Amino acid sequence: MNDLTTAGKVPSSLLRRLFLLCWFVATVAVAQTSEVDLFRQLSPQHDSDSIEMKTLYLDADALAFFKDNEYDGNITKGYTLPGVRFTPHLVYSPRAELRFELGASALVYDGTNRYPNYAFHDIVTWKGGAYQGGAHVLPYFRAVVRMGAATFVLGDLYGGASHELILPLYKPENLLTTDPEKGFQTQISTQRWKMDAWIDWQSFIFEMDKHQEAFTVGMTQRVHLLRPRRYGWSLDVPLQMTVQHRGGEQDDTDLGVQTLSNGSIGLQLRKTWDRHVLNAAELELHALGAYQQAGKLWPFNTGSGLWAGAALDLLHALRVRVGWWQAKDFVTLYGSPFFNTLSLKVDGARFTRMNTAYWSVEYVRPFGRDYAFGAKANGFLTDAGQLHRKDGSTDPAALRHAFSFGVFLRAQPRFLLKRFK
């Protein structure tokens, strides 16, 4: 989108950051009892308990947001996201095991009325020859079948926060920029094991088409070694994988087949308390890998990374997180560019390493089931290695800090339209 606000080097940038951070702290000072996972609170709530059989409902799901990314340096560009995502849809359940949803999904950014008319995977490149006016609109359809411990989904998937991908593999901001995931999904949940497998079909091609077929296959598994009991301890082993494939038998481009993947295995320890101030603490450690099975999109075929993180839930309203990341020859498919060793700002350039310290403070206050207000401030302190450009020149290693701040309001009221006999 050509109307995105790009952050530049202005003398007042530090003052802006301090003002936003002070405003954020003042806001959370009046926090009241709430759930603390902001990403999950802002995602559509897939609660089926309140759905009566043979009853037609209207869900008016909306997320209003304003997010400012003050980025500097040669890793990625800064930008601002002001807008709303609106997904009104009908919901009907003919039987306890079946559920159908039908509607539309619209993404609207303030300050523009033209949108590139193709699949949104992130901040997209403007193509003025094919665009939609008013909003980026897609049809919405979901069919859900529940069979014992398994749930099968066709159409619009339970994506985003539902996958529970770790931060280096998936950035929450995708909720504000990418198209809803569509395809097929299987979820299984037992007492000791939880699995989510999906295929997100992102780009369909016709005969003689001028772009590539693209889809992502993902799987997350979580083994519960220790579940919360009397003393509130839990210990999990999460295994996660995402694979993106581009190409297709109908592909008439000269780009060739490209298959890229990320994977991780880790350990997560969590302790909860029934207290007013300290509610929960969490530690996590994950080993990650990146693999280019086909294609030459990356200048390397394998890479690795290590992620360690800690979090505190406070006052039933705040979450404070810190993390440390170090990587070599690693590219994340859907995570933040500050975990990459490729530059998204300098074409074809790569870093010899990427060490990143991460921090975030989140505040969320739900108003019943249907509404939630949230705010988040976070930063990346990067110790990037030497930057190697395509022309053979290099930039010295540098220590930089990138800052981001956002406010959000989710509304998902449900209206009963008709009961059928």
Show which residues each predicted segment covers:
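Surface-exposed strand-loop-strand hairpins of Gram-negative outer-membrane beta-barrel proteins
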Residues: 63-85, 115
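Residues that define the transmembrane beta-barrel architecture of outer-membrane proteins
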Residues: 78-86, 133-139, 178-182, 211-217, ...
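Outer-membrane beta-barrel "beta-signal"
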Residues: 399-421
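Outer membrane beta-barrel transmembrane domains
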Residues: 164-168, 297-300, 304, 315-383
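Surface-exposed coil loops of outer-membrane beta-barrel proteins
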Residues: 151-222
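Transmembrane beta-barrel strands of outer-membrane/channel proteins
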Residues: 58-66, 102-106, 154-158, 197-201, ...
